[in-house]
């Protein structure tokens, strides 16, 4: 199969993975309206082509939280990453490390912090959820610090899990789920051999280490359902600073006022994100939400963005809309499922090449030169027409 884009990796991953795993990462909440709009809205952002600008000294390098990145991209936290390739977190981290960008380990990873961190030179980032079990949160923070993690990504848009209807149909949940997953694995021998047999243990490494016992997929589903804390507020986050003195990023911001609250709280960064369309269906796409948030807090806090980014052109679009750096989630997981570390490395190379083409043809020699001026402004609006808020007439 010819691989020339992330979309090729998606098709390959669908053939390789058992349906319960493919649809778990590919799907979204409810009718998946926001999932689709994440991609569609971003693809409609029109870039302003410029020519004869002498682009011979173009650079993608940028700095974030006193770290130098080879390009403004980091790998996002993805749960169960180790179910998509043998010890998947280790392989993805290695690809990111070789490229010179951060890897973010999920709370609900298969490989624990202590397994991943020693395999890479660059300090990795660690993602943590807001949970009822404060003892687990404290333990995870202490372990992340001991392992040399540099940045905490605190996910706040999951006070309760979203309703993902695909999971019940695919076998991730629903009637006879365990039996359905077993037969799906039998029908996908490449995955069954590489991950099902040779990728063990399939524990949730960070949770097992705290609970002192193995944890499987059923434990994962039950633990998540029982531990998210809907009572959390900004004030409750203050105690985290007692245990974490490094950069802290608040992930899951879609409203300018929440972005201002993050600044007041003293966060170092935010991630403009709707959790990849996996939480609340019908909310704004990240591309629609980003410009207003950038207007509110740009310069006061680092702005990261995810959801809908599929290629290097999308990275440039997000930066032009106001992001400093982007996070890749699904795109890298498709590549990981297809070809492990080599797949992720190739995807990152493709994104780098696509970014260079986009920057060359928009006249931006550096990341700092990508701005709203890189976008086509239509009818005097401050946003591209594709992202302008709908009028009442449009909504009808």
UniProtKB/Swiss-Prot annotation:
* Top enzyme category: oxidoreductase
- Tell me which Gene Ontology terms the entry assigns under biological process: aerobic respiration; lactate metabolic process
Question: What name is this protein filed under?
Answer: L-lactate dehydrogenase
Q: Which residues form the FMN hydroxy acid dehydrogenase domain?
A: 1-380
Write out the catalytic residues in the record.
Answer: 275
Checking InterPro entries in the record gives: Aldolase_TIM, Alpha-hydoxy_acid_DH_FMN, FMN-dep_DH, FMN_HAD, FMN_hydac_DH_AS, LldD
| Residues that hold FMN according to the record | 106, 127, 155, 251, 306-330
An annotated Gene Ontology molecular function: L-lactate dehydrogenase activity
Q: Gene that codes for this?
A: lldD
The keyword Disulfide bond belongs to this UniProt entry's keyword annotation: no
Q: Indicate the family of this protein.
A: Belongs to the FMN-dependent alpha-hydroxy acid dehydrogenase family.
Known EC number: 1.1.-.-
This entry carries the following GO cellular component terms, namely: plasma membrane
């Amino acid at each position: 199969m010819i691989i020339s884009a992330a979309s090729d990796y998606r098709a390959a991953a669908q053939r390789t993975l058992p349906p319960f795993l493919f649809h778990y990462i590919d799907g979204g909440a409810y009718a998946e309206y926001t999932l689709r709009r994440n991609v569609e809205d971003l693809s409609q952002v029109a870039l302003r082509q410029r020519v004869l600008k002498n682009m011979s000294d173009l650079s993608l390098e940028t700095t974030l939280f006193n770290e130098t990145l080879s390009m403004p991209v980091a790998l996002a936290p993805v749960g169960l990453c180790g179910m998509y390739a043998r010890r998947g977190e280790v392989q993805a981290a290695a690809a990111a490390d070789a490229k010179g960008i951060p890897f973010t380990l999920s709370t609900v990873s298969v490989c624990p912090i202590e397994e991943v961190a020693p395999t890479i030179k660059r300090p990795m980032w660690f993602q943590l959820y807001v949970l009822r079990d404060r003892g687990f949160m404290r333990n995870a923070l202490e372990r992340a610090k001991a392992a040399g993690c540099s940045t905490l990504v605190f996910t706040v848009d999951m006070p309760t899990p979203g309703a993902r209807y695909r999971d019940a149909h695919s076998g991730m949940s629903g009637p006879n789920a365990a039996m359905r997953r077993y037969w799906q694995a039998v029908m996908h021998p490449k995955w069954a051999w590489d991950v099902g047999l040779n990728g063990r243990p399939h524990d949730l490494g960070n949770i097992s280490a705290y609970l002192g016992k193995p944890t499987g997929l059923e434990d994962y589903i039950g633990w998540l359902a029982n531990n998210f804390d809907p009572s959390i507020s900004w004030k409750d986050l203050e105690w985290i600073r007692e245990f974490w003195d490094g950069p802290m990023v608040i992930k899951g911001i879609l409203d300018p006022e929440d972005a201002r609250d993050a600044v007041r709280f003293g966060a170092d960064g935010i991630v403009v994100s709707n959790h990849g369309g996996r939480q609340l269906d019908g909310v704004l796409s990240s591309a629609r939400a980003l410009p207003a948030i950038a207007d509110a807090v740009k310069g006061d806090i680092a702005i990261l963005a995810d959801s809908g980014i599929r290629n290097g052109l999308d990275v440039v679009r997000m930066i032009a809309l106001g992001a400093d750096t982007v996070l890749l989630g699904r795109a890298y997981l498709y590549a990981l499922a297809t070809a492990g570390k080599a797949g992720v490395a190739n995807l990152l190379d493709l994104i780098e090449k696509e970014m260079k083409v986009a920057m060359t043809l928009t006249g931006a020699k550096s990341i700092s030169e990508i701005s709203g001026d890189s976008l086509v402004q239509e009818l005097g609006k401050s946003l591209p027409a594709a992202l302008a808020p709908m009028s009442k007439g449009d909504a009808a």
